[in-house]
Amino acid sequence: MSNTSNSFFDGDFVSSNQQVFLPILEEKKVELFIKREDLIHPFVSGNKFRKLKYNLHEAKKLKKKSLLTFGGAYSNHILATAVAGKLEGFKTFGIIRGEELGKNITKTLEENATLREAHEHGMKFHFVSRELYRQKSSFGFIEKMKNKWGDFYLIPEGGTNFLAVDGCQEILTKEDSEFDFI
């Protein structure tokens, strides 16, 4: 893990509101704005950025050196965790639903841009059957992963936990209070 206290997540990430102009909106006298959370980072943006922010802060606080999370073969959460983990100096491990994908990893990475990008950012994969994937939160499964990869900070599937909620609360700011509907 990096020895510096600087963090990818430490900046002031207030996303802009971009107005959408369409004839139908003008005709109906409606103003429509889109919150541009997608502009934060090419791979770690929007709710993925917000969900990971405090989880990675907590992992650092606990002095963890690696992260483990779960997802499907096309999971944006898997990719965001790999990229954010690399930026923050963590090793990353992904439990991927679909054991057939692990039978020919070269072919899988050629055909699956999401897993390829996560792999290129250093994530190591463990492919499991859908049945075993349903047991991913069990004590026995987690212990097997600790035996395989050592101690890690566990991020739930999709990054969803109370720390993720704290991060997502930062999406709306006082500048957004002027809107009637969100």
Predicted regions and their residues:
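PLP-dependent amino-acid enzyme catalytic core
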Residues: 1-182
